[in-house]
Amino acid sequence: MVFRRIQSVRVIAKSEIHPQSEAKLQKIARILVDQAHNQAWAIDPLVAAKMNPANPADASYEQFALAAEAEGFTVATHTTGLITAEALSGADVLVLPHASTDEWEKTVGSGSPVLADSELEAIEAFVVAGGGLLILGETEQPKYGNNLNELAGRFGVKIANATVQDTERNFNDVPTWILGEFERLSDSDFAYRVESACLYRAGVLEVTPTAKAEVFMRSSEHAAPAAAALGVAVKHEAGRVVVMADSDLFGDDSINDCDNKQLWLNIAGWLANARTAALANLKRPATWAATDAKWLSLVEAVEAMRPMQSKDGSIDAAEHSHDEASRLLDQVLAAVDALAPKFAHQSAYIAAVKVDLENWRQGGFAVPDFFDSLELFRPDLDRRNDVENFAIFSMYTQNGNPNRNLEAVITKTFWPDWLAAKEQKYNNAAFVPIEFVGFTAGYDTNSAVFFPETVATRSVATYYWGGIFCDREAARFRRVAKAAKELLYLPLPADAERLLNDQMLAQETFVLWDLIHDRTHSRGDLPFDPFMIKQRMPFWMYALEELRCDLSTFRETLVLEAEGDRLAKYMRYAILFDRLFRFPITGGRVRNYDGLGGQIMFAHLHKTGALQWTDNRLAFDWDAVTAAIVELCEQVEALYHDGINRSRLAQWIAAYEFVTGLVQPHPASTWAKGVEHLPTDGELKGMVNLILDDEFPLNVFYDTLNRKLADVIASTKGITA
């Protein structure tokens, strides 16, 4: 057995397709195409030319392989010998093209079309362990002398002896060139960007009742036989199998007909996802901090001090013993000293934070001040992958603990080379993506950020850096989006499913999204200070600003994709699903500006028809989604552009009218009654005071989603990868 790359005769050593090497090459998965069992289709164009000199395309699967490689797969061929566990060890997907005796087809001329018993066992074991298998059958299947049916039968499918004809739904008026019809509301979206697929002299498939199978393509009601299965997807143990009733549709002379190529890529993606799906729920190994005595001693002391501290971080001697607080602080300082050698690169910060902690004690545990040490905490100056940083401050955690308690956290910087290269284009010197190594209770919450302004200081600290916990962002997104997918019966394209199952891919996606989003706050036509969190403005202004940055990032993915960026398509799914499924139902209903942004996006997509909510099932018109999101981005940008010539009050009103054009306001809203009911001649705060806590209630879709996913949302508290 050898592996050969397409358009090459060089033998590839097994070490060259090791998973770690593939990760560096950023390939989706490894596809192995069998060419050792007298296949009627050749991957090698030279072999195809020998098989059919007059029309090599009628014997070639070269374009089949090249399409997969262009999509991000590695494609190799198995050209000699038996299919064994060793032969399959470097593959994620095995493709078995139609095979035949020489009596019926011109073939590659290698091996027997009959799989040996040991091969059948090896292939089944490969699937059980999480492999993907594609079996390509044919019309009048039994006559070709292969035993693909024996293999397909192990997964509950049979390729029947038939030829489908359709005089109404066919290609080029040929009755045997039938157009398949897709089950649009299937578990997986094999019809993603497939308007039509043509099969050429197809057989039909039969499925046993016990198989965990889904028929995703059938013949039409006008065909003979009518509504017969043409494509079947099976989930078998940890693996996946697809059986097709035709092999011609992926040949070189047919793969570019209709949307046959896209169908092949959808199938390949779904099969490849078996491996990521099997690993989706695995937790990463615990970090060193989980068992480190020094860190655990620090956590113990911090948690013991937590109930002593007031909201501002001080400790009231009338309620709590300062002697006990002092003893606990000694334990904190001792633990910091013990941990210091592990963070030698932070020696200046650690020395300063010890002084700040001691000054807190000497000041009678009054309101703490960590300004001096915060100025020396600079993770932005050492953005290298896997660099760990230690921090201890009196601080609140955004979307977590609102009180300025003493908190300790150890972070690991996520800064792979590819991200460093991206930052050269999307420059953002303050951006520091991080992962959790260890944390105290303030981060056992929904908080996924670490910002300087959360720290207790005597004056506003310099904004040198902003930390984003990409592991938490990715993990909670995956959990909520998967639950929403199941609840809403949403069929997912293969790329979207891969994103939801792959933690590292999701982290990479969120980091690039965050990088572009964050810098967008200071770019564009800005009728106000975008960093307005401390200003008193209507909460829909915050909603529009956060939404603007996400919409702009979504649009930028089209630029990235044109440049060949592998993450662009995943970013679009992440922005769409996080905004639609998680944001609106996370947090309370008190002026929830992030939630409102998701409500606006849903309303626009529903209004334009890019999103449909019918029969309690959610569906997207994926081509329309992109255009609709870009349109919404342009509308928000126009609102901003025109706002430069408006007063602040006029912009608030214009923004309100924009939002209410999509999201219905509360029936009791004063703002909704019109400008004549607002105190426009008074102070602006009077206008803000009239805003209801839930000015824009959840619609019936989100009301249902909120009730049914409440436990899932709650379960993401404190989540890590």
Q: Where in the sequence are the language-model features?
A:
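Short, surface-exposed patches at the edges or C-terminal ends of soluble domains, predominantly
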Residues: 3-283
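N-terminal low-structure segments adjacent to metalloprotease catalytic domains
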Residues: 279-405, 678-721
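Contiguous, non-catalytic segments that form substrate-binding/exosite surfaces or channel walls
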Residues: 337-497
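Long, well-structured alpha-helical subdomains associated
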Residues: 507, 558-658, 672
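Active-site recognition of the HExxH zinc-binding catalytic motif
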Residues: 510-526
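C-terminal, non-catalytic "cap/extension" segments appended to globular domains
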Residues: 627-721
